[in-house]
Design a protein with these regions (language model features):
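Domain-level signature for soluble enzymes in the chorismate/prephenate branch of the shikimate pathway
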Residues: 1-318
């Protein structure tokens, strides 16, 4: 049970208002949390994560993975640098884009379109078919593109329209010139709630764990060695990406999500295996998966199977 006298957690998100990330936070907050209006927007993912590290807020919502464009590098890299952070939970948000502009804008007058770098590739086909001569102008977020058009920014932006969420068009009083312009109508983005390390949510039976792994050196079979740790314990991976470490050309780490909770025996054994064969393993949290799908262990990888094997080994040693 939550303590009714405990202060509400202070939340932040990758903003400004009207981002898909704010929508993710709205669906995450419960009646016990402070309201969405009290949540602080941060203009970049790195600023949002730094605010948690500095203790300015307790939790922030950031995008991590899109079903069309893949991993959000800014988040993967910022989660992985500086002081440790952990993921407390995840949210899935269906992504619907609109083309929005100040009221009265003539579509024929649009020369530039502003949006986030992860949004643009998701509307590329629509743009090529409908606004082939418009050039793309990158902005910090989809909502930042809309906000600047509304004249709230310091100066006029170098574009006439924005690709953003319907909510951003509404918040910043823009006119929707075209609805539902995503090339893939079933696009979904996954967002994560991040805090400083301290508590790990209890196992729910439908959990995921995120780690970043650094290998000792570049050698034949290095990746296989690492994958074997998962395969041998019947663990399903749900995302695997290599990211440059930035230390030297060809130096990569692996960012991995897999099914199970750090409290599960098979997950513990896998983490120990990784720790043995790799130079470093950064634990980024165990949390309930957004779709709530239960994680099934195979007959040979249940907690009971591990406990039985451990008891047997102990009896031999005794
Ligand atoms: O710019 C926003 O509105 C965001 O919340 C970021 C973000 C992302 O980084 O993927 C979220 C969902 C969309 O796929 C496009 C942009």
């Amino acid at each position: 049970m939550t303590d009714p006298h405990a202060p509400a957690l202070r939340h932040g998100y990758f903003g400004p208002q009207g981002t898909f990330t704010q929508m993710a936070l709205a669906s995450w907050l419960t009646a016990d949390d402070a309201t969405l209006a009290a949540a602080r927007p941060f203009g970049t993912v790195a600023l949002a994560l730094d605010a948690v590290r500095a203790g300015e807020v307790d939790r922030v919502m950031v995008p991590i993975e899109n079903s069309v464009e893949g991993g959000v590098s800014a988040t993967l890299d910022a989660l992985n640098s500086d002081d440790p952070l952990v993921i407390q939970g995840e949210v899935l948000v269906p992504i619907t884009f609109v083309l929005a502009a100040p009221r009265g804008t003539d579509r024929a007058a649009i020369r530039g379109v502003g949006s986030h770098s992860h949004a643009w590739p998701q509307v590329r086909g629509w743009m090529a078919a409908n606004l082939p001569s418009a050039s793309y102008v990158p902005t910090l977020s989809t909502a930042a593109a809309a906000e600047a058009l509304a004249g709230l920014g310091e100066k006029r932006p170098p574009y006439e329209a924005a690709v953003c969420a319907p909510m951003a068009a509404e918040v910043f009083g823009l006119e929707v010139l075209a609805d539902d312009i995503g090339d893939n109508r079933s696009a979904v983005t996954r967002f994560v709630v991040v805090s400083r390390p301290g508590t790990v949510p209890p196992p729910s039976g439908a959990d995921k764990t995120t780690v970043v792994i650094y290998q000792h050196d570049d050698h034949p079979g290095g990746l296989l060695e690492l994958l074997e740790q998962f395969a041998a314990r019947g663990i399903n991976m749900t995302r695997l990406e290599s990211r440059p470490t930035g230390q030297a050309m060809g130096s990569y780490c692996f960012s991995i999500d897999f099914e199970g909770h750090v409290a599960d025996e098979r997950v513990g054994e896998t983490l120990m295996g990784l720790r043995r064969v790799c130079a470093d393993v950064r634990f980024l949290g165990s949390y309930r998966r957004a779709d709530g799908r239960p994680v099934e262990a195979t007959r040979t990888t249940t907690d009971e199977a591990y406990a039985d094997a451990r008891a047997w080994l102990q009896s031999l040693r005794d």
